[in-house]
Structures are given as C-alpha cells and as structure tokens.
Amino acid sequence: MTVLVRYLSPEWIDAVQAELTATGALVEVAGAHDVGITQVVTDTPHGTIVYHLQVGGGQASFASGPAEPEHVRFSQDWSTATAVATGNLSAQDAFINGRILLVGDQQKLMDSQPVFGALDQVFNSVRARTDYSDDA
C-alpha cells in the first residue's frame, strides 16, 4: 500500500526533494542554469505555504521558505495550485487568466525552461503518492 503525503505539507516537500535527489533530473541542468524560484500558495487548509526550488552550480534543492537568492516568485491560491498540480488546469491558462501571479526576472524564467522540464519528471513521480484533498 502506498502511503500518501498531503499536498504542500512538510512531508510532501521532503518527498519532492527525495525524488529530486534520487532521479538526478535537475542536477543535469543545474550546471547550465542558475535560478531561485519561490512559490507562495495562499488559502490552503493550513494557511499560506511558501516553498522554493534553488538550482545552480551543479546542484538543485527543493525546500520550505523563500529561495535565496530569489529570481522569480509565483503566487496563487489553493484552488489554482491544486488544479495545476493535478492537471485539471494548465499553468499557461492560469497565467493568462491571472490566477498565477509572477514577480521577478521574466527573462531568467524563460531562459530556465529546461529546469521546468526536468522538474516535471520529479512532480510526475510524486503526484501518484500525493493527497490533494482540502481536509485540514
């Protein structure tokens, strides 16, 4: 039986970091890219959650709190975050409709697209072990 981790919980953040480490997916692109991305998710069952992805110098990490240094910050509410994470809403549609707000270096974000491709591999693996319910 697979043990589920609640989306955006400390255990989920740890599971993403563990998968990132196990697959090495981001390490391959971390030598060519240097970016700190902070995610802020509001209105979750446990308040506002802040976590980040830090990539650069051949290393990648995923942890609670803001990126240091932070190049890009995404902000969204719980319903948007869960809809995007479960594939019920594309991130592109969420941006276009103003449901995800972006602050920071947009050019660095565009230059870092290979990072997001590698991160998708990590999220796809963790998604199968994630509980997206909003039960507190």
Located regions from the model:
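Feature captures hydrophobic
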Residues: 1-136
